[in-house]
Amino acid sequence: MKEKTCCVTGHREIPEDKLAYVESELKKAVMAAVKDGYTRFINGGAAGADLLFAAVVAELREQGCPISLEAALPYRGRLNSRDPAFQTMISACDRIKVLCEESSRSCYYTRNRYMVDESDLVIAVYNGRDTGGTVYTMNYAQDKGKAVQVISI
């Protein structure tokens, strides 16, 4: 039986006054997914929604939830980031998947498609913009018949 998988998509810039709300909503969404049998959680390694999601998953796992955290990185050089939040996320991951060797515009779309293709549920932290990676990923997920849960900011 295929393990139930959930991924996140969302904006890198989350307004300061929305951070606590987004973190709380991500926690609720992840806990509901765990109760529904989800055990594998994938994040794309970007600032903002991805790292908040990863921190929530890592915290639940530390509390004893039998879940795994995966980073789907768009290109290998991303591993060289010195951002402390990124490095904390990487060290918490059970698996790291690198989608492309070199950085390019297309590697981000490759990463987003991988996450959706692997997932049954996509949690989207979305500000209503009609362009960009978040809306692309949401539309791709809907085209693939995946469940999309939106956290509006």
Predicted features, each with a name:
Residues 1-153:
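Acidic/glycine-enriched connector segments
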